[in-house]
Amino acid sequence: MSYIGLQQDSGEYKIQKIHAREILDSRGNPTVEVDVFTPKGFGRASVPSGASTGTNEALELRDADPNRYGGKGVLTAVKNVNTIIQKELLGLDVRNQREIDELMIELDETENKSNLGANAILGVSMAVAKAAADSLNIPLYRYFGGSNAFTLPVPTMNVLNGGKHAGNELAIQEFMIQPKGAETFYEALQIGAEIYQTLGKFLENKYGRSSTNVGYEGGYAPKMGESTEALDALVHAIEEAGYTESEVTIGLDAAATEFYEEEFYNIDGKKLAAPELLDYYVELVNSYPILSIEDPFYEEAFEDFEALTNELWDTIIVGDDLFVTNIERLSKGVDMGAANALLLKVNQIGSISEAFDAASMASRNGYTVIVSHRSAETEDTTISDLAVAIGAEMIKTGAPARGERTAKYNQLLRIEEDLGEVAHYVQL
């Protein structure tokens, strides 16, 4: 039982002030940060942004002023928080998360939060949750999840980048390692970091120093042309670091919408139709220790997701752009058997309450839940607490490098320490 819910009015928990500001994210672009104050507590949250985004995501409001940040400023969203949203939320009980989220959604009056901006609404939603937890003097993961929050997710670490996250010829966007054989999250993080460092040395020796330049999420971005070349490098690094394929598996984020054009997929120098791409994935899974494939097809190709899920029934097929953390799209996927896992991104849907709804629907229907960052991040660690609170099987938050990525991993270390002997590392 979590602490979120309709609470009796108490002056100690009333929202006194909400203040938003424009800050920079990890790509050097503006984003929204929000502070929420009560007599007993304070919450601060900042909003991430994606590079490869689903068409059906909630709208991130940008100023479109070419004289500031190339049109990417967020002063309009900031103003919406400081005027419209603050006016409506002042005096409300900060513990009433759903009431507050629904009020903001009603204020916006659009399906995709395009009036106030999903970045404005989400910033307030996360800061409200943090202020509530602080006011109650309990950790955020405990506020979200109550006594059921005790599991630590398996990290799926993006250690080699392609696609929109890098400047090489790899079509597949992310090649990830998953230390699923660890006993604790602490051990999993150590395994991931050791493989990451080993991979870096291997790439430098084989491809030169420039191959260890990193992409948006901290993964290396060497000049590679084919997926098998990247997979061979990962297998080598896993073995060289002293681990086995049963201890550490591989995850792929194809982000296939990005290389889909006129009913064909451009990958590894080839132009493949959907059935050919399905065979390509099957061959990869049969050749490498691949546990998961994210967005293997175009974001509207529900039937192709269904076909691959049936073909690779013991592989985790993840819907990201397919579902965009939206319960209507997820419901369609569940009905069809399209994918068997949900990538949960709070900024795709735009509020904490709606993210919880999507996670709940996925879990009820036997889907794996993977909580995820975005390519443009901040030092905010809300998703770490969220992953523990909902019992997510995995968390995807980049390489064990770059401060905005390690912030999330380090927060999970603190949570595991705080939980003590009751902490349980997920076994996949």
Swiss-Prot record:
Which pathway does the database say it acts in? Carbohydrate degradation; glycolysis; pyruvate from D-glyceraldehyde 3-phosphate: step 4/5
InterPro entries the record matches:
Enolase, Enolase-like_C_sf, Enolase-like_N, Enolase_C, Enolase_CS, Enolase_N
Query: Per the record, GO CC terms?
Result: cell surface; extracellular region; phosphopyruvate hydratase complex
Task: Give any GO molecular function from the UniProt entry.
Answer: magnesium ion binding
How many cofactors are bound and how? Answer: Binds a second Mg(2+) ion via substrate during catalysis.
**Where does the record place it?**
Cytoplasm; Secreted; Cell surface
Q: Which keywords does the record carry?
A: Cytoplasm, Glycolysis, Lyase, Magnesium, Metal-binding, Secreted
Q: State the SMART domains in the record.
A: Enolase_C (SM01192), Enolase_N (SM01193)
Q: Where does (2R)-2-phosphoglycerate bind?
A: 173, 345, 374-375, 396
Keyword tRNA-binding listed: no
Which residues are responsible for catalysis?
217 (proton donor), 345 (proton acceptor)
Please describe what this protein does.
Catalyzes the reversible conversion of 2-phosphoglycerate (2-PG) into phosphoenolpyruvate (PEP). It is essential for the degradation of carbohydrates via glycolysis.
- What's the protein here called? Enolase
Q: Which species is listed as the source?
A: Methanosarcina mazei (strain ATCC BAA-159 / DSM 3647 / Goe1 / Go1 / JCM 11833 / OCM 88) (Methanosarcina frisia)
Report which gene this protein is encoded by. eno
